[in-house]
Amino acid sequence: RSRAQRIDFKKIDNEEVKKALIERRLLDENTAHRIARIAGGNWNLALEELDSGNENRQHLDMFIMLMRLAYMRNIHDLKKWSEVVATFGREKQKRMLDYFMHMLRESFMYNFRQPELSYMTQDEEDFAKNFARFINEANIIDISDLFEESKKFIAQNANPKIVFFDMALKVIVLLIRK
């Protein structure tokens, strides 16, 4: 037998993660519950969510800015937004687009008012409360495809300024779809 063998570790139960977060990190029950659900049995991911410098917070800010500027049809500031995003490294840009797809899905699921379907932090949910009504059956697939296509272009070494500005302009059109 080979010495390099795969060993599967079982996920930690969400209740155990929640309990550990309350005991070891002194979190309140609601926050611990949210983080445990998002982590899905991964203690390292739970600790990552606690980190205030978490990359997801920056991605959330960029997502909020994109959606607000697109809703206001502010082309000039969308151009600036795309230039800022273009300064990120390619891998970070791809992670950001993955995060955008996550927020899109969570915003759509928020419309169903089923908390067990939602995997959002408190900050994400605070934004989704008002934003979710703009994501519906008429536009979710097209916006998701747009983010996926943009990620593909970035991976293929396309000019990020052009990719992100084009994406931002298309989001304007897709957000107004009912």
Where are these predicted regions, by residue range?
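Charged, glycine-rich active-site and insertion segments that engage polyanionic ligands
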Residues: R1-Y99, M103, Y110-L117, Q122-K178
